[in-house]
């Protein structure tokens, strides 16, 4: 197992303290049924949640920022059901938002599937990508499965190196 520790604070407090700022959380979205606030199965909630986050990103960095200076972290564990539903959601929303080739990273290829800190694994990896411009490839694949939706996604085992200032989201 693993542990992730992230300190979140108000913008003014961070500036007053002279804290190094790695990113910001402009909003949080969830759309799930039941008592456990996670997505229990494929459905419209997945699309709604991700579309809201993408719309927020677009409102902050503009259409070009979202279309040309963003990437996405896949969360699905590589199981047939997850790879199909997750790739379908990402691909369809990339198309909807006018993204032609959205780079996809999946940190689980390097860390495995941690339980509680899985979101923290992805958060810290994303912060590193924004700082250094290095989008990790998915090292555990040598080709895409036939059932992966990828007409608007760039999914591969090769790392993508970009200048750090070329990534907004």
Language-model regions, residue ranges each:
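Conserved catalytic cysteine-centered active-site region
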Residues: 1, 90-121
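Condensing-enzyme catalytic core mediating Claisen C-C bond formation in acyl metabolism
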Residues: 1-65, 70-71
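Conserved beta-strand-centric core segments of catalytic alpha/beta enzyme folds
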Residues: 1-13, 116-169
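Beta-strand segments within the central parallel beta-sheet cores of soluble alpha/beta enzyme folds
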Residues: 20-28, 63-74, 101-109, 137-147, ...
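A general structural signal for well-ordered alpha-helical packing
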Residues: 22, 47-51, 69, 86-91, ...
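Short glycine/threonine-rich loop-to-helix capping motif typified by GTGT followed
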Residues: 34-46, 76-93, 114-122, 154
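Stable alpha-helical structural segments in soluble proteins, enriched in small hydrophobic residues
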Residues: 49-62, 89, 93, 122, ...
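Short helix-capping and hinge/turn segments at secondary-structure transitions, especially at repeat
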Residues: 55-59, 74, 78, 95, ...
């Amino acid at each position: 197992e693993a542990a992730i520790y992230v300190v979140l604070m108000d913008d003014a407090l961070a500036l007053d303290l002279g804290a190094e700022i790695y990113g910001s959380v402009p909003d949080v979205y969830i759309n799930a049924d039941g008592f456990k606030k996670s997505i229990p199965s494929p459905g419209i909630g997945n699309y709604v949640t991700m579309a809201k986050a993408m719309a927020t990103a677009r409102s902050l960095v503009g259409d070009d920022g979202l279309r040309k200076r963003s990437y996405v972290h896949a969360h699905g564990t590589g199981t047939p059901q997850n790879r199909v539903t997750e790739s379908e959601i990402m691909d369809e929303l990339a198309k909807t938002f006018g993204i032609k080739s959205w780079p996809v990273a999946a940190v689980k290829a390097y860390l495995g599937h941690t339980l509680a800190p899985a979101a923290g694994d992805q958060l810290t990896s994303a912060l590193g990508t924004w700082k250094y411009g290095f989008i990790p490839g998915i090292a555990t694949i040598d080709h895409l499965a036939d059932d992966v939706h990828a007409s608007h996604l760039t999914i591969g085992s090769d790392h993508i190196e970009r200048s750090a200032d070329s990534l907004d989201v």
